């Protein structure tokens, strides 16, 4: 059985980039978020979240949007997810709006925001309120390298 740690595979002492088999994946322990999750529904709360997150060096980033099933149909994001090392914020952007402090946070190049294929999410958020994204890292691109 292969042994794992938070930093990668342990064995010969070096981290390997080999593909994991289904058996290896199924042998991994299940993990889930155990920290606080905050639901944000007002502009004031969204501004406070932006202020809180602006003290971080790294944020997790994602959005959730209603799926479209017809050609040409599209919807705006309903949820902006921001995660620090210790807490998660679920911002209901249709209720709170893309307040200035949130736009400033998403534009700040000094704070790394990591997500999977964030360009689509960012384009959708920019339809709610214009801003120039800064500091975003696409984890799917990094995973392919």
Please state what every model-predicted region is.
Residues 60, 112-118:
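Acidic beta-strand-to-loop metal/phosphate-binding motif
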Residues 63, 93, 116, 139:
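Residues immediately flanking
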Residues 35, 87, 108-113:
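Short active-site oxyanion
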Residues 1-59, 124, 128, 139:
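N-terminal accessory regions of nucleic-acid-interacting proteins
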Residues 48-49, 97-109:
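Short, basic/hydrophobic alpha-helical segments
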Residues 69-87, 94:
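A short alpha/beta connector and helix-capping loop motif
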Residues 81-85, 110, 119-145:
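Metal-dependent phosphoesterase core characteristic of DEDDh/y 3'-5' exonuclease domains
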Residues 53, 58-71:
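Short acidic, Gly/Ser-rich segments with clustered Asp/Glu that frequently serve as metal-coordination loops
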């Amino acid at each position: 059985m292969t042994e794992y740690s938070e930093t990668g595979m342990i064995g010969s002492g070096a981290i390997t980039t080999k593909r994991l088999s289904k058996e290896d994946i199924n042998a991994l322990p299940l993990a889930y978020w155990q920290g606080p999750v905050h639901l944000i529904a007002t502009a004031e709360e969204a501004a406070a979240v932006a202020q809180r997150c602006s003290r971080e060096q790294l944020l997790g980033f994602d959005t959730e949007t209603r799926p479209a099933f017809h050609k040409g149909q599209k919807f705006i994001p309903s949820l902006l997810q921001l995660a620090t090392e210790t807490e998660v914020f679920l911002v209901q952007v249709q209720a709170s709006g893309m307040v200035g402090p949130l736009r400033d946070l998403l534009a700040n190049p000094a704070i790394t925001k990591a997500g999977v294929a964030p360009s689509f999410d960012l384009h959708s958020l920019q339809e709610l309120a214009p801003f120039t994204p800064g500091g975003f890292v696409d984890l799917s691109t990094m995973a392919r390298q």
